[in-house]
Amino acid sequence: MAAACAGAFVAVFACTQIALAVFGNTKSVASNTLSTSTMAAPTGLAAAGGANIVLTWTATATTYATGYNVLRSSTSGSGYAQIAQVTPRATVTYTDSPSAGTYYYVLQSYFQNWISANSTQATAGVSTNTGYLPCTANAQDAGGDANGYEVSPGNACANDSVFAQDVNSGTSTSTSCTAAAKDKHRFYNYGFSIAASSVINGIQVRLDALKSGTGTVPKLCVELSWDGGTTWTTAKNTATITGSEVTYTLGTTADNWGRVWASTEFSNANFRLRVIDVDNTTTQTFQLDYVAVQVTYTPP
């Protein structure tokens, strides 16, 4: 019986009672009790996207844990695969640099071959951009002289120091971007290729321009349309235009011009850019070498 009980002890590390025969006497030994430990996952997982994805979390409460497994998926709630192992336990950040897209993350605490359950999920995306794309079409708009850039307007669709010109611009001395008496011109058909359901992060407009007339506060104002020119954003304006060609950039990679955009609104049928020439004189000549647009977005 003693041998059988000893074998059970080796197998399961416990024996409720061992009967020992020592010189014909029997002695009872108290039972042994095993405790269990559940390894805790880290808490508070968060993800911040952009050019890459930064994960942050609160360390596991399991003090003997070695570190963390980092798992990633392109599908919410499933399909996770381990992409990294982070040590020591006190580490609470990890930077991932996948290709553009939206990703889902969970963490596990680990010690040797033991792992915890998954943490809560966090999600973030890596953005990309279209690059600066030129217009391929243009049209004068109502306002001012009603002729916009009347001299070679197509020149503004190429970056070559050959200029479109708006001569003797406007019919009033107002310096407001919204004044009806200011010359306006539309530039469009940028040929954007943005994946459906992408999140639009920001829109930047590049204007290469100079002025060659009188007036003291010349500037270019820009409005954007998402419905073919029916509705427009609030205008943004450049600094004062000088007599030398300068590149002006309006908007940032995180500036959506006051609205939430859908990827479909950048089609050639929908997207329009309107340039409005403004100065405190009607004898100013605006020269525009290049109009280009860059869209920063996060694919689905």
Task: Please annotate each region the language model reported.
Residues 1-24:
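Sec-dependent, cleavable N-terminal signal peptides
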Residues 19, 105-106, 273:
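Hydrophobic beta-strand segments within extracellular beta-sandwich modules
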Residues 24, 108-112, 276-278:
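Beta-strand-rich extracellular modules
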Residues 27-64, 113-130:
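Pro/Thr/Ser/Gly-rich low-complexity, intrinsically disordered linker/stalk tracts
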Residues 65, 100-102, 266-270:
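Extracellular Ig-like/FN3 beta-sandwich strand-entry sites
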Residues 69-100:
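Recognizes extended acidic, P/S/T-rich segments that occur
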Residues 96-116:
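Beta-strand-rich modules
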Residues 129-300:
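Disulfide-rich extracellular domains of secreted proteins
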